[in-house]
Every structure is written in C-alpha cells, then in structure tokens.
C-alpha cells in the first residue's frame, strides 16, 4: 500500500461525497480566509494525492453510509502552542491521539 492509499484508508468515511476548501485570501498572520464546500463525488486517490502535494484542500466525511464514524479531529487554534509539551501530555496520559501541527501554526489531534 502506497502512502496515498494508507492516508485514504485512515480517513475513510462517506463514499458519496467529500469536502473541498479553496483559499480566498490571507485573513491574518498564519491564518487564511477560505471557502469550504461539499462536492457530491467520491474522494479519489488522485484528489488525496493533490491534497498531500499541497495543490488542493480536501477532506473526507468521517460518517459513512451506515452512520459509523471512523475518525475525529480536534483543531487547536493556539498559535503560541508548545507542540512538544502537548505531545508529552498526550503520551503521559496514554491518549489514543495523533498530533500534527496545522498549516496555521496550531495543532490537530486525530482519533482513529
């Protein structure tokens, strides 16, 4: 399984649609003004590859056709966040979370 296939398998969900985001303008330091919308077509490997390459903002809908939720995310918009300290807290508490820095400088915590 290549990295794109692994990524799409982690973020699986509803097969009939996906989200897309188009950046409109810089809103403030670190944050961009964007328009997000639903595209009523499946999320494909090509779309995910474009997302991973930084060409397109896409997202899967985490609730599938059977109402099963496959993942969740917390968006932390604290731009002075000490990512190392947060990582250590997650590890010390043995929380089943994956920590990633967001583009704007905050963080995302994913639960699978």
What are these regions (language model features)?
Residues 83-92, 112:
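Helical (often loop-to-helix) elements that flank the catalytic cores of nucleotide-handling enzymes
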Residues 55, 67-69, 92-94, 103-106:
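Short, well-ordered loop/turn elements at secondary-structure boundaries
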Residues 73-74, 96-112:
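Histidine-centered divalent-metal-coordination microenvironment in nucleic-acid enzymes
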Residues 58-63, 87-88, 94-102:
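Catalytic micro-motifs at enzyme active sites that drive phosphoryl/nucleotidyl and oxygen chemistry
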Residues 1-71, 79-86:
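DNA replication initiation on ssDNA origins
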């Amino acid at each position: 399984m290549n990295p794109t296939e692994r990524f799409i398998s982690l973020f699986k969900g509803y097969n009939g649609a996906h989200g897309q985001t188009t950046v409109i303008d810089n809103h403030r330091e670190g944050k961009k003004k964007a328009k997000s919308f639903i595209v009523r077509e499946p999320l494909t490997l090509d779309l995910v590859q474009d997302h991973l390459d930084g060409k397109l903002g896409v997202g899967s809908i985490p609730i599938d056709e059977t109402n099963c939720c496959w993942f969740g995310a917390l968006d932390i918009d604290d731009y002075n966040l000490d990512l190392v300290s947060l990582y250590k807290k997650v590890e010390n508490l043995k929380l089943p979370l994956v920590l990633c820095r967001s583009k704007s400088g905050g963080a995302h915590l994913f639960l699978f």
